[in-house]
Amino acid sequence: MSGAQRGQRGGERRGGRDDRRGQGADKTAYIERVVAINRVAKVVKGGRRFSFTALVVVGDGEGLVGVGYGKAKEVPAAIAKGVEEAKKHFFRVPRIQGTIPHPVQGEKAAGVVLLRPAAPGTGVIAGGPVRAVLECAGIHDVLSKSLGSSNQINIVHATVEALRMLEQPEAVAARRGLPVEEVAPAALLKARVEVPAGVSEEVSS
């Protein structure tokens, strides 16, 4: 067998492995949103060393979402680190017919985010950082308002804190000693989206 033929067969084998890796990647595809990219400098003896930071939101669009922060010398590497960090902090978000079960408020540092349920067809009424988190989580109808700090990192984490505080209507009703119908509209309860037990617990990627 000639060297060219061996090289050709070797290339075919390598291509086969690449194809298998591609098929595996499709099974774990997620929605990724880059919220912010910043260049930072570190002063050292020889001068300044520049690097990039990336704030990334990752979700499956079906109630699973996480936020990550990556830092590297190049933008793509910073984003990749942010994606991996976000996957380590996945958590489940309770949803009912594409919206949230009840109003909620999240705070992080000086950032405050208010979220309220909305009727089907309303859409995501939110600014960029809040919208990124909600869309990755699979929330399609919601009203939001950001107060206090305009820092994107604080706003994103305030949104995450708000989502972590969400509960299923049954849990809220049991705690308050009320019928479920008084906690959430009957129309939403009828068309609710089932969420696995332990919605507030983090899950591995």
Curated annotation (Swiss-Prot):
Residues 9-24 have a biased composition (Basic and acidic residues). The keyword rRNA-binding applies. Residues 1-25 are annotated as: Disordered. The keyword Membrane does not apply. SUPFAM superfamilies: dsRNA-binding domain-like (SSF54768), Ribosomal protein S5 domain 2-like (SSF54211). Keywords: Ribonucleoprotein, Ribosomal protein, RNA-binding, rRNA-binding. GO terms for cellular component: small ribosomal subunit. One of its GO terms (biological process) is translation. Residues 30-93 form the S5 DRBM domain. GO terms for molecular function: rRNA binding; structural constituent of ribosome. Part of the 30S ribosomal subunit. Contacts proteins S4 and S8. PANTHER family: MITOCHONDRIAL RIBOSOMAL PROTEIN S5. The N-terminal domain interacts with the head of the 30S subunit; the C-terminal domain interacts with the body and contacts protein S4. The interaction surface between S4 and S5 is involved in control of translational fidelity. Belongs to the universal ribosomal protein uS5 family. With S4 and S12 plays an important role in translational accuracy. Located at the back of the 30S subunit body where it stabilizes the conformation of the head with respect to the body. This is Small ribosomal subunit protein uS5. It comes from Nocardioides sp. (strain ATCC BAA-499 / JS614). The gene is rpsE.
